[in-house]
């Protein structure tokens, strides 16, 4: 499908909020972020010593998220107060796993770190967590909400398999990776919120897949700088595009068509997720606020005609906190 047909294929993107600009913008999210983002000690000093307090481990997770997963940090701020610290712990756990691949020079070292987290999860469920800030906070979350161990292990197992620097063979392989990582994260978030609902699970599955696809697109310039390309090979072959085309940042139409096809799949998952909104408990909506950031990226990539390397796609959206707050206030996702 040609990229120029995006508008008719996707329909309108629901990012604007008519009428709200005349009201005083809600400021609670920024105020909450300022309160929670004060400087904290480094990971080494937080984890060391026997006097590590609850606030120390909690603040370590906050700072890790603020630096490494800012969108997840903002979304977590809008969860109910009683669920917030557990969500921070869960996302910090995900960050710890996600950054292993890019922080090691050898796969063997990465496997050792994954093994550490597998043992950590086992120890958490044996009420014997290691003296590591994220592990301690995750242990508290597991005890507080009786989180399902299987989802945590799925995230580790899938991240471990992804240590191989191989492109996804097809879009289904990328979706499977996203299901086992991002969707699993959302299933656990629903458990933190006390939600047991089949429709909410279906929505979480689609949102997680959309998140995984968008993350793959967003990370392509970074991976390209390290001479890696992970976009689905079947779609690249369909349009006659090689990995070298992405490495040299080609502006050719067939390269943009690859990006269009991949982005369209993310858009389709968002559409499916929203089709459940009338059947899902309103209490579950805060778990799905990341759709705001996903749709923002998809709108931007449409505006630049699917030029994956356009500078505007690398800029942080300064209005994202406001957009998230408004969607939360409207009880939408």
From Swiss-Prot:
Which Pfam family, any one, appears in the UniProt record? SQS_PSY
Q: Which domain of life is it from?
A: Eukaryota
Keyword terms: Membrane, Mitochondrion, Mitochondrion inner membrane, Transit peptide
Q: Which residues form a coiled coil?
A: none
Q: Which InterPro entries match?
A: Isoprenoid_synthase_dom_sf, Squ/phyt_synthse
Targeting signal (transit peptide) range: 1-44
Q: Which GO terms describe its biological process?
A: biosynthetic process; mitochondrial respiratory chain complex I assembly
According to its record, what are the GO cellular component terms?
A: mitochondrial inner membrane; mitochondrion
Where does the record say this protein resides? Answer: Mitochondrion inner membrane
Q: What does this protein do?
A: Involved in the assembly of mitochondrial NADH:ubiquinone oxidoreductase complex (complex I) at early stages. May play a role in the biogenesis of complex I subunit MT-ND1.
Write down the PANTHER family for this protein, in alphabetical order.
Answer: NADH DEHYDROGENASE (UBIQUINONE) COMPLEX I, ASSEMBLY FACTOR 6 (PTHR21181:SF13), PTHR21181
Q: Which family does it belong to?
A: Belongs to the NDUFAF6 family.
Q: What is this protein called?
A: NADH dehydrogenase (ubiquinone) complex I, assembly factor 6
User: Which species is this record about?
Assistant: Bos taurus (Bovine)
Q: Which gene encodes it?
A: NDUFAF6
């Amino acid at each position: 499908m040609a990229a120029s047909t995006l508008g008719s294929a996707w329909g309108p993107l629901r990012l604007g909020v008519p009428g709200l600009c005349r009201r005083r913008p809600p400021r609670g999210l920024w105020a909450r972020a300022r309160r929670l983002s004060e400087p904290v000690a480094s990971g080494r000093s937080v984890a060391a010593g026997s006097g590590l307090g609850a606030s120390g481990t909690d603040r370590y997770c906050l700072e890790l998220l603020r630096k490494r997963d800012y969108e997840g940090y903002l979304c977590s701020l809008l969860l109910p107060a009683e669920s917030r610290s557990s969500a921070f712990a869960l996302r910090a756990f995900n960050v710890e796993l996600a950054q292993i691949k890019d922080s090691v020079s050898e796969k063997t070292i990465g496997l050792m770190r994954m093994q550490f987290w597998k043992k950590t999860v086992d120890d958490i469920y044996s009420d014997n967590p290691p003296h590591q800030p994220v592990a301690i906070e995750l242990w508290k979350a597991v005890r507080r909400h009786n989180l399902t161990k299987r989802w945590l292990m799925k995230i580790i197992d899938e991240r471990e398999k992804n240590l191989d620097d191989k492109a996804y063979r097809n879009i289904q392989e990328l979706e499977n990776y996203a299901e086992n990582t991002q969707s699993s994260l959302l299933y656990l978030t629903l458990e933190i919120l006390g939600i047991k609902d089949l429709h909410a699970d279906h929505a979480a599955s689609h949102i997680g897949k959309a998140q995984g696809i968008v993350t793959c697109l967003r990370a392509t310039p970074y991976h390209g700088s390290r001479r890696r390309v992970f976009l689905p090979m079947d779609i690249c072959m369909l349009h006659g595009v090689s990995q070298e085309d992405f490495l040299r940042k080609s502006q050719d139409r067939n390269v943009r068509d690859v990006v269009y096809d991949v982005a369209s799949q993310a858009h389709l998952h968002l559409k499916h997720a929203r089709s459940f909104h009338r059947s899902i408990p309103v209490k579950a909506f805060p778990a799905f606020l990341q759709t705001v950031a996903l749709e923002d990226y998809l709108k931007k990539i449409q505006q630049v005609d699917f030029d994956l390397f356009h500078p505007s796609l690398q800029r942080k959206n300064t209005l994202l906190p406001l957009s998230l707050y408004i969607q939360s206030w409207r009880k939408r996702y």
